[in-house]
């Protein structure tokens, strides 16, 4: 029966022979490499302005091809790009973003003005008929008229 140490050394030697380990056996010693040539072949995925496999005439067309609106300040979008950053936001992206933000702000403003209780919570709002005359400061009908402190005989605007 083989010992554990021998099995570990054998596995280490196999990994070194395949080029997956560097000379120093460390925790991060597995080499990460780029895939080139036939290793890099993968599924046909939408990349760039074209969609689908190149031999598919239904998906791989120039119909509806959008390369950005150059007159509105967009950079032209290439047919294909690989391992490059995106060209930035296009005019359509900016318009859709502006429209969505305008709708959200309109909804928020409308509801803050007309239905603020939905956003801030409800509180009890009593009817005016629930208050008594005494709470509102209204004298009884049988009470004598209060003395009026007015300026009856003076011209308007001269008594202040």
UniProtKB/Swiss-Prot annotation:
Keyword Methyltransferase among UniProt keywords: no
Q: Where in the cell is it found?
A: Mitochondrion inner membrane
Q: Which BP terms does GO give this entry?
A: mitochondrial respiratory chain complex I assembly
Task: List the membrane topology term(s).
Answer: Peripheral membrane protein
Name the predominant localization: mitochondrion
Superkingdom assignment: Eukaryota
- One GO cellular component term, please give it: respiratory chain complex I
Arranged from A to Z, the UniProt key words for this protein are: Electron transport, Membrane, Mitochondrion, Mitochondrion inner membrane, Respiratory chain, Transit peptide, Transport
| Subunit description | Complex I is composed of 45 different subunits.
Q: What does this protein do?
A: Accessory subunit of the mitochondrial membrane respiratory chain NADH dehydrogenase (Complex I), that is believed not to be involved in catalysis. Complex I functions in the transfer of electrons from NADH to the respiratory chain. The immediate electron acceptor for the enzyme is believed to be ubiquinone.
Q: Give the family from UniProt.
A: Belongs to the complex I NDUFB2 subunit family.
Protein name according to UniProt? Probable NADH dehydrogenase [ubiquinone] 1 beta subcomplex subunit 2, mitochondrial
Classification from the root reads: Eukaryota, Metazoa, Ecdysozoa, Nematoda, Chromadorea
């Amino acid at each position: 029966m083989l010992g554990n140490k021998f099995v570990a050394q054998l596995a280490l030697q196999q990994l070194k022979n395949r080029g997956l380990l560097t000379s120093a056996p460390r925790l991060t010693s597995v080499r990460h490499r780029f895939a080139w040539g036939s290793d890099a072949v993968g599924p046909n995925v939408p990349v760039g302005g074209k969609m689908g496999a190149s031999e598919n005439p239904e998906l791989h067309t120039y119909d509806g091809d959008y390369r950005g609106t150059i007159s509105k300040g967009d950079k032209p979008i290439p047919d294909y790009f690989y391992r490059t950053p995106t060209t930035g936001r296009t005019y359509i992206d900016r318009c859709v973003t502006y429209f969505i933000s305008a709708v959200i702000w309109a909804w928020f403003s409308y509801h803050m003005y007309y239905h603020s209780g939905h956003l801030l919570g409800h509180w009890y709002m009593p009817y005016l008929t629930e208050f008594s005359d005494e709470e509102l400061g209204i004298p009884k009908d049988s009470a004598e008229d209060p003395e009026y402190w007015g300026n009856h005989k003076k011209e308007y605007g001269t008594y202040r």
